Amino acid sequence: MSKKWITTKGGDKGETSLCDGTRVPKDSLRVELYGTLDECQAHIGMARAACSYPEVCEELCRLEQALGPVMGYIARCETLPVPDISVLEELIEKVRTITGETFRFVRPGDSLPGAALHVARTVARRAERVAVKLFRNNELDDSSYAYVNRLSDTIYALALWIDHLTREGKGTPCE
C-alpha cells in the first residue's frame, strides 16, 4: 500500500475533515475561516521574505508560527492551546512604543513588505467577517473570536513599523 502525501482524495466530493474527524462541506464557515487565516499567513510570509529589518522579520516569523496552532484550534484540534490574544496585544504595544504611531489612514505602498502586510491585513479583516458569523451562532469561542478580531490590528501595526523604518532612511519610501 502506498502512503498518501498531499492528495488524500477525501475532498473529491466537496467535503473535508476537521481535526476531530468531523466531515464538513469545504465551503462551511469554519473551513472558510481557517482557510482565510491560511491565506493571511501566506501574505505575512511574503512580507517577511521581502523585509530587511531583522527585528521586524523576527516578529513576523513569530506571528506566522502562532497562526498555525490558531488555525488548527479553529479546525477543532482540541489538543492545541486556546488562542492567546495577549501575544498580539503585546506586539501592538511594542510597535506603538517604537514608532510613536497612532491610528491613521494610510496609503499602502511605502515599502514592499509594508504593502504585503496591508494585503495580509485586508485578508485578516475578511477573516473577521467570517468569524463574526460563527461567533454569533455560538460556533466559535470567545478567545478564538477575539484573536481573529485583534489580528488585523496587529498586522496594521507591523506595517506601520516597517514603513516607519523606511521613512527613517532605512529603506526607500514611495514618492
Regions found by a protein language model. Give the residues of each.
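Phosphate/pyrophosphate-binding loop motifs in nucleotide- or prenyl diphosphate-using proteins
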Residues: M1-E175
